[in-house]
Amino acid sequence: MQFYTHTLPSGAALVGYLRDETTEMPAFNIRPAILILPGGGYAWCSSREADPVAMQFLQAGYNVFILTYTCRKDDTQPPLRWQPLIDAAGAILHIRRNAAKFRVDPFKVAVCGFSAGGHLAASTAILWDAEPVQKALGIHAEEARPDAVVLGYPVITSGIMTHGGSIKNLCGDDAELKATMSLENQIRGDLPPFFIWHTVEDGSVSVQNSLLLASALTEHKVPFELHLFNHDGHGTSTCTREVNTPNAHNRAWVGLCTDWLADLFNYHL
């Protein structure tokens, strides 16, 4: 395995776990890629939603990247506005433009985000062509848009069911930007497929966020799969002892997700 590191212009850190090329498994020398975007309320990036998640997808045969994107560490810093999305879209662009080097299929690049990182992952699919993103990256095409989106207990809305801290760190008091970042109102028919999971008992980011997204995706006929688990709270990541949230039932999301991606990408080990 190769370990890859890259620093984006903002200082955001991209790391990659890349499977080695081999003559013994030539059919798998080119693999799909997945970019992990940890949560943390846009204030930090959770380690529990980084490597433990990456290892699950690495085991499923993916080349895996993790992005530590720009965050607002305290209230003395200005709102982040578009910078996290510029970071994430820039990471997707970097993966695609280096697909041959990374032995990645450039048409099979997924993103996976949790909580605020879920908002960011969804934004890469929904707001990839927003003017601030296109201008910052110098692109006018779909190079920075993912081919599939995986969301765990995502922040979606800036409305009444929002996670206030995440939206405050992202938008501050800018009402227009808050409206733009309320993603359930930005859905359109040309989006990539979504896989979404949430717990009904989540007391931090309401399950209504995922339900609002699912409703909007349904309205616009965007393919998606939604899994709701009754018990457990927020930030459960892989639902294992390693991340201090063991739940044998809820951890089924990992297998459900890798099966969904395998069918979508026609990539079966």
Model region roles, listed by residue range:
Residues 30-39:
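Short beta-strand element of the alpha/beta-hydrolase
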